[in-house]
């Protein structure tokens, strides 16, 4: 007689089978799901009366099922559903349940948060006092790397001086000394140092080493002194001179070998030129021209006067007062016996003096100033030995020739060039009949030019093209080759 437990189990199976509208064969067909786990199969067969062989045969026996038309489901019930049908008898193990749950659980995508810049309503209702306090603490504790003296720097206020470069006894720049006092007061007010920036302020700049900053060259080689001379700022030039520990800094050349004195001459700044000369500026440009050479070429009378007039006692005394702190090398002390007319005899790299440059440019007023300061009017230039009178004849400048003949008492009409030609002979060779008549009236010796290869045809051959054709002809070298033409490659 079957036990009550087995009868209850059989009734439960029958009820589940009827509810799912499945046949007994379908229930037996579910056996392979549990058959995959031998322990589960053994437990099932033990509870059903130990008919393992019959149940296995029933499972292995092929069955035919009615496939629904709506879906392609084969009719098998998955593991979790079969566990409900089989109730306590057919229960998969924990590993099988975990695997099924992982397969059935959908993968959740990570939410993508896009910041639209709109403040949520929750954030709007937050305590603004706390947020403000946090942000303020962050601002106070942040180190931006900017020195405090840079933030507190300002221009002239209430008539205060921007700097104290004009005071000979001062040793510090005013802006930096103000910072030191403000730093001391800040330190007394805040001894703990909370909220202070970590970057320490730079040390005060002394006048003794400030020239290193103010005499740096830019991409064109110009220093602040060059730029100040171009702009015509006399006060800035004087302040830069006071900072220079040695006069050689005033002779720094730019990329075209121009010093501040050259730029002052080119821009017609006589006052700046005078200051630079008192401070000991000199040196030539890339063509060997001094500031006086450039002024003679440009015809600037005021600049020429500033460069040729001797220093007065007042100027020398003022120079000692302003620049005496760096005169230990006798750069300024030598001004007491310096004489500027000595510079009138300096030649440039073409061998030309100031009188030659002024004569070539036709500046009679400049020549008058040079002659009044003792310039040699009979000086010969370095290339061919021409004097200013030869230059006037070559350019057929009657006004210049009349000035030289009338006002220059030391003019020598018989001064010859390196080729031995006087002014009258030079006029004959150049076919300047008007100039010959002027010289004859002034008492020049009417001597014909000496027999030489220097004639009017040679002057025409000075053209570059004719010179090339002349030397390009092999017959030109016949006389130098023993009568045999020289082959020119």
From Swiss-Prot:
Modified residues annotated as Phosphoserine in this record: 45, 135, 384
A Pfam family recorded for this sequence: Ank
Localization annotation: Cytoplasm
GO molecular function per UniProt: NF-kappaB binding; protein sequestering activity
Domain of life: Eukaryota
Stored InterPro entries: Ankyrin_rpt, Ankyrin_rpt-contain_sf, NF-kappa-B_inhibitor
Biased amino acid composition, Polar residues: 69-86, 163-180
GO BP of this protein: antimicrobial humoral response; cellular response to tumor necrosis factor; dorsal appendage formation; dorsal/ventral axis specification; negative regulation of antifungal peptide production; negative regulation of canonical NF-kappaB signal transduction; negative regulation of hemocyte differentiation; negative regulation of Toll signaling pathway
Modified residues (Phosphothreonine): 174, 308
SUPFAM superfamilies referenced in this protein's UniProt entry, alphabetically: Ankyrin repeat
Stretch list, region Disordered: 1-138, 163-203
Segments annotated as ANK repeats: 220-252, 256-285, 287-316, 350-379, 384-413
Any Gene Ontology CC annotation: cytosol
Major subcellular location class: cytoplasm
Bias (Low complexity): 1-26, 181-203
Keywords for this protein: ANK repeat, Cytoplasm, Developmental protein, Phosphoprotein, Repeat
Functional summary from the UniProt entry: Involved in the formation of the dorsoventral pattern. It inhibits nuclear translocation of the dorsal morphogen in the dorsal region of the embryo.
Record protein name field: NF-kappa-B inhibitor cactus
């Amino acid at each position: 007689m079957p036990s009550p437990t087995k009868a209850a189990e059989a009734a439960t199976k029958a009820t589940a089978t009827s509810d799912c509208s499945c046949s007994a064969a379908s229930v037996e067909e579910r056996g392979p799901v549990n058959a995959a786990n031998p322990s589960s199969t053994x437990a099932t067969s033990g509870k059903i009366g130990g008919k393992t062989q019959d149940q296995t045969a029933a499972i292995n026996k092929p069955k035919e099922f009615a496939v629904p038309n709506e879906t392609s489901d084969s009719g098998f019930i998955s593991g979790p559903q079969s566990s409900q049908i089989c109730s306590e008898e057919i229960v998969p193990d924990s590993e099988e349940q975990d695997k099924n749950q992982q397969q059935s659980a959908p993968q959740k995508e990570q939410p993508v948060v896009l910041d639209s810049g709109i403040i949520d309503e929750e954030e709007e209702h937050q305590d603004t006092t706390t947020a403000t306090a946090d942000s303020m603490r962050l601002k106070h504790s942040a180190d931006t790397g900017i020195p405090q003296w840079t933030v507190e720097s300002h221009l002239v206020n209430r008539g205060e001086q921007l700097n104290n470069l004009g005071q000979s006894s001062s040793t510090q720049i005013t802006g930096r000394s103000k910072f030191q006092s403000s730093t001391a007061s800040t330190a007394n007010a805040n001894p703990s140092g909370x909220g202070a920036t970590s970057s320490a302020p730079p040390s005060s700049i002394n006048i003794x080493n400030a020239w290193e900053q103010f005499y740096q060259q830019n991409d064109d080689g110009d220093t602040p002194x060059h730029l100040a001379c171009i702009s015509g700022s006399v006060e800035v030039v004087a302040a830069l001179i006071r900072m220079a520990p040695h006069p050689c800094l005033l002779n720094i050349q730019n990329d075209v070998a121009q010093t501040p004195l050259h730029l002052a001459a080119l821009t017609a700044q006589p006052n700046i030129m005078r200051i630079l000369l008192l401070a000991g500026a000199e040196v030539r440009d890339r063509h060997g021209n001094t500031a006086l050479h450039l002024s003679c070429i440009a015809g600037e009378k005021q600049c020429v006067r500033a460069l040729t007039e001797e220093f007065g006692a007042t100027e020398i005394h003022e120079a000692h007062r302003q620049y005496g702190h760096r005169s230990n090398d006798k750069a300024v002390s030598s001004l007491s016996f310096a004489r500027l007319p000595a510079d009138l005899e300096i030649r440039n790299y073409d061998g030309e003096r100031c009188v030659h440059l002024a004569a070539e440019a036709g500046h009679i007023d400049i020549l008058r100033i040079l002659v009044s300061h003792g310039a040699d009017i009979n000086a010969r230039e370095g290339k061919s030995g021409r004097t200013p009178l030869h230059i006037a004849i070559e350019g057929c400048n009657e006004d210049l020739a009349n000035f030289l003949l009338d006002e220059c008492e030391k003019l020598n009409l018989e001064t010859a060039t390196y080729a031995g030609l006087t002014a009258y002979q030079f006029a004959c060779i150049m076919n300047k009949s008007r100039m010959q008549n002027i010289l004859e009236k002034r008492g020049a010796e009417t001597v014909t030019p000496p027999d030489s290869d220097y004639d009017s045809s040679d002057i025409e051959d000075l053209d570059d093209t004719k010179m090339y054709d002349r030397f390009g002809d092999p017959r030109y070298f016949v006389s130098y080759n023993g009568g045999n033409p020289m082959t020119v490659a």
